[in-house]
């Protein structure tokens, strides 16, 4: 008898010990291939903008409004209205955004996937999305989950008597979890011990609290929280100390003090928290729950497990006497009572009004009234002197408060969408806001092919080198972040503060190049009939392309770098210098630049930069190899310029790096290397970790071998030009 059927089969394919188990520090090249077409179930030609614009938005709003009071037995609505639940859902979808790297936020519908779908701060939002499913099912691909989550929050506010500032669609769904977002290093939910620099070496962005400095780019105080611990720092119920955390994390998502107060007070005008019983009644999160739960989690064994017995945060607080109607109840209670510390039924720190009458409605029993309660972080708005002044001003001026909350809510839910050019739908507000990084509309006739050729000739005859032309264009365009769609060449903000002064851009050399290009621009524009002009933003990109064409010609290749005019020049008044400061790269491996020394190796920072530029591993490889031989570097060092003919577009970088006649040894620690002739010991090249990784990492070496091969040069030039044009056009949403 065969034993075949009795052999154990313990592990599925793809399981077992992985490369990352063996080598935990392996380079995360997989980050450059996430969200590929292989994970997208929609047809290759599907155009979301067209689909959204065909949507009957009014009908959808009516369906959502009807849902608000259509309480379901399987998950009853608090106070008979789902509005507060959906406000929380939208808030938590958008609230993961952080301005440090632009990641997180509502833009890709990631609340559906791990880890966000299983964060402790998102308990019960699995039910909110299931309540929405019949409506999503009805409208199909005309609205993404990402857009629907935010629209539902907007409708929820409207049905509770609040006038919102506007709504824009345009968020396209992804179909798998993000892998590029760093949420922290803790390995336990609600852990926070690893994200704070206890010695104070890290500098806080928004004021001092010695020994409590949050790691960049994180914008939450504990693993699995959206912002702060509502019980206070590390559970310490100190409203003043909590104000520090609030200011820090809200600041990291681009909110100032007024916006912060407006969001907290406005959001807490509605609904309640849930802590009906001890947390040990709550089961596993969705990602760990059994198949039979069908993607739901946190099954609650306390009482009925729902309604009045719901457990989410463990806090049991209702802020207002009118929790499903916009009003000033939050401020009225906050300043109308003195508060004493108590504990929720689940044992969490919260506050109850002293000497108060029960005025707060019960969420599921109209015959009952409760005492007013608050969170520690609510009291921060009263006991922090800055927040208190703003709060009292809002309390005394309800219209000012309503406008501030409307604007802050719109910013919260649209901050990661990028410029207004990406906004879809009839409800887009007409007012232009500084945080949208506004760029003027095109107001002139654009240049055409008959203008481009002589302009290139003028540029190449200007005395500027290939390296200067290419590096300036790269500096302008490579600020783009695919995370929140900020930055890029459009606007020519390379000539404005703060970008013109960034060390990576070599301000003196940049000023020299810009002066020449501005002269060429002025001479061209002053001689054109019919209102034809070229913006400096366009000219910078055109000049970079001209430099590449010249470098390719020197290598014996005639190429044309595609150029699409249509960029405009922003003004300093349209540029929030503080907001743009976060776009300054701490490292740009494409220019062999690292600003200081970091625990993260330079090659990992290159991957991070490439991922923000939406590049694939082959595109990154082609760009690094090309920029090196074009001598596009920050500073005077020639690290990685593995060629005897710089500013010529060759495959020398790859061929010389892979040449076994060269032996590499580290110098100056681990970050710089010498390449010497293996036989004579003669110094041939110097390189950085970013340079050598293309020969060291097995995957990058395989890609480099393609270009280093005898038949690789023509392909390399094609690939380099294509990747270059991609970066130059990343912010050209009008070309999509």
UniProtKB/Swiss-Prot annotation:
Positions of crosslink type Tryptophyl-tyrosyl-methioninium (Trp-Tyr) (with M-253): 91-227
Native species: Burkholderia cenocepacia (strain ATCC BAA-245 / DSM 16553 / LMG 16656 / NCTC 13227 / J2315 / CF5610) (Burkholderia cepacia (strain J2315))
Matching InterPro entries: Catalase_peroxidase, Haem_peroxidase, Haem_peroxidase_sf, Peroxidases_AS, Peroxidases_heam-ligand_BS
Keyword Transmembrane helix recorded: no
Catalysed reaction, written as an equation: H2O2 + AH2 = A + 2 H2O; 2 H2O2 = O2 + 2 H2O
Catalytic residues (positions): 92 (proton acceptor)
GO biological process: cellular response to hydrogen peroxide; hydrogen peroxide catabolic process
Function: Bifunctional enzyme with both catalase and broad-spectrum peroxidase activity. Shows peroxidase specificity towards odianisidine, ABTS and pyrogallol, but methoxyphenol and 2-chloronaphthol are not peroxidized.
Protein name: Catalase-peroxidase 2
Position of the Tryptophyl-tyrosyl-methioninium (Tyr-Met) (with W-91) cross-link: 227-253
Site positions (Transition state stabilizer): 88
CDD domains: catalase_peroxidase_1, catalase_peroxidase_2
Residues noted as binding heme b in the record, renumbered to the chain: 268
Subunit structure: Homodimer or homotetramer.
Protein family according to the UniProt entry: Belongs to the peroxidase family. Peroxidase/catalase subfamily.
Keywords attached to this entry: Heme, Hydrogen peroxide, Iron, Metal-binding, Oxidoreductase, Peroxidase
Pfam family, one: peroxidase
Molecular functions per Gene Ontology: catalase activity; heme binding; metal ion binding
pH dependence, entry free text: Optimum pH is 5.5 for the peroxidase reaction and 6.0 for the catalase reaction. Active from pH 5.5 to 8.5.
Cofactors (names): heme b
